[in-house]
Amino acid sequence: MNAPLGGIWLWLPLLLTWLSPEVSSSWWYMRATGGSSRVMCDNVPGLVSRQRQLCHRNPDVMRAIGLGVAEWTAECQHQFRQHRWNCNTLDRDHSLFGRVLLRSSRESAFVYAISSAGVVFAITRACSQGELKSCSCDPKKKGSSRDNKGTFDWGGCSDNIDYGIKFARAFVDAKERQGKDARALMNLHNNRAGRKAVKRFLKQECKCHGVSGSCTLRTCWLAMADFRKTGDYLWKKYSGAIQVVMNQDGTGFTVANKRFKKPTKNDLVYFENSPDYCIRDRDAGSLGTAGRVCNLTSRGMDSCEVMCCGRGYDTSRVTRMTKCECKFHWCCAVRCQDCLEALDVHTCKAPKSADWAAPT
């Protein structure tokens, strides 16, 4: 009763959807999916009909979103680089992060926010670079206007962030809008907070025209800030995320602790406390911290005491090539020697229990 090989590939997306944890944003897997737009749209597991429809109609936008996935996951990993959970991704899992996001935790709140922000950023940038058929520069930024420095003319290419937000809302929120449960409402709230974060750092840039740079005339445009600003802002929101519970009629949230203020549209919200991420735990989706590099002199989250959860650490001596004895040569170059540097690297010990290395 061996199935033909072609039949196995035909059913593989369905099997992945059935066997994998139910995480709403399976579109994250678009990072790893290549080929034609039809192959991509039909073989990313878990997309709802509205998402597939948008995917088929806008293959150029989907390419931009797919490229953006790598960017926002890298930003997530940068923000969590010194923490026990370091936003690690699983290449073989269509949810990208595995079971860790099944919990309605602070980490889930951050990932949904940064991913939604990443879609806005990727689409808006692609619009300005002329890569999309459906949008270009912001058409509303025309003619003259005023600011606190006087009159200026709109020129150049203003980032069309309203289009990016509109498409991101339609595509990213599509699955959550089909459900009325608490997790769907949590995801929608954090998705919106992520989109708003990108727009928060839209800035006006100007170029002066006139004799000797006198700036008698100014041409201005709106541009998104580097995505790092959005990541830093959402990290602060993660640190101050508000724990909530559903209200009695199931239409919104109320704070879990009455001493805290009601969350705004810019805040991140979560329902469940996070696991400690110390040990590998299949159910929690935690990979643990065994083998993670720690900082012996730090007192923060990256310290060996905190990162290793009190288990201790191993120290190894390694060498690396660095630039040294750099000298400035007129004009205008800096020349350096290549030197070998020896340093100690500290890594967290594994738990003593025999089952810590069980695969997740």
UniProtKB/Swiss-Prot annotation:
Palmitoleoylation is required for efficient binding to frizzled receptors. Depalmitoleoylation leads to Wnt signaling pathway inhibition. A lipid is attached at residue 212 (O-palmitoleoyl serine). SMART domains: WNT1. Pfam families: wnt. Glycans are attached at residue 295. CDD domains: Wnt_Wnt2 (cd19345). GO terms for biological process: animal organ development; canonical Wnt signaling pathway; cell fate commitment; neuron differentiation. This is Protein Wnt-2. The gene is WNT2.
